[in-house]
């Protein structure tokens, strides 16, 4: 993927040129300089921007601080894609805090015209030691992806991110139309904290899909991908809503050489509202999910609930005190309908402690999937509160952007 960075204005040859050309070049230089200064001239608008991850896997092996050590010259306030790119400054890994004070259209208001065009302009690379935080309820991103790839120590907080719409999905025989582009990608990266972030299909929901060649023209991929040996990730107090294939941890059954022993991820105090599946689906990784709320409907017209926890090849998951409210649940393969919140994809390790399904306790360990109990030690301090319908309501109310 391409790194987006501010490019300086090249020196123009003056031979045979009019004074108008020289003035145009000067104007471009001034405009570029002003753009950088707008991105650079900012005071810290919230002390939340200097906070580090306080629990979960992101606290381990040195912790996750993002841009907490940023100097005053590396604190920015941005409200446009040009300002955002200027603040990121390409691959500059010096600590920085980027405060998002407006709705940022990553496309810059120019519609994508092809796969190549969307790939070139919609994928925004985030460098190491960066905190990106929305101010109030103003921090929004549309028409693109935040790509955290090959870096370390990144924090995303208090943001609304609309899942991108693929303008040129590809067709796979036997599998139909498939889309690219996730809202957030964590790839080959360690130490990431995602907190109070809302990711949603927003204005373009799946019931608006058309058909092409007789099949549904799918234009959404995932909300969040964590893959290729990424490690030490915490996702907290966030809201995932109105989406189908939501969170993937480990992208392939054949990537064990890179993923084994990594992909350690914590999910706590999140709301998954009207999402179809993969919250998460895990391969190779070790996932700890506690005090999360899952709301869905098997008969939903756009986002039919299928399952929450997908246990894939060499993946393991510990569930503690989660709340599932799923309408129109049905028995699958002769098992109790409550067992449908878990799906086995060749995975062998899963345990649940104290979760409730539709307001009542249920033993998910007795569903007959043949899982071994999760026995790995959780190395960080945490507090999984006893889940009740009242607590589930509080978690839901606090989840997502604008609540920090």
From Swiss-Prot:
Its main location: secreted. It is found in: Secreted. Pathway: Glycan metabolism; pectin degradation; 2-dehydro-3-deoxy-D-gluconate from pectin: step 2/5. It catalyses: Eliminative cleavage of (1->4)-alpha-D-galacturonan to give oligosaccharides with 4-deoxy-alpha-D-galact-4-enuronosyl groups at their non-reducing ends. It comes from the Bacteria. It holds the Pfam family Pectate_lyase_4. GO terms for molecular function: metal ion binding; pectate lyase activity. Binds 1 Ca(2+) ion per subunit. One of its GO terms (cellular component) is extracellular region. The keyword Nucleus does not apply. InterPro entries: Pec_lyase, Pectin_lyas_fold, Pectin_lyase_fold/virulence, PEL. Residues 1-41 form the signal peptide. Ca(2+) binds at residues 182, 225. The active site is at 278. GO terms for biological process: pectin catabolic process. Its cofactor is Ca(2+). Its EC number is 4.2.2.2. Involved in maceration and soft-rotting of plant tissue. Pectate lyases have been implicated as pathogenicity factors which induce maceration or rotting of plant tissue. PelE is sufficient to induce these effects under laboratory conditions. Belongs to the polysaccharide lyase 1 family. PLBC subfamily. This is Pectate lyase E. The lineage of its organism: Bacteria, Pseudomonadati, Pseudomonadota, Gammaproteobacteria, Enterobacterales.
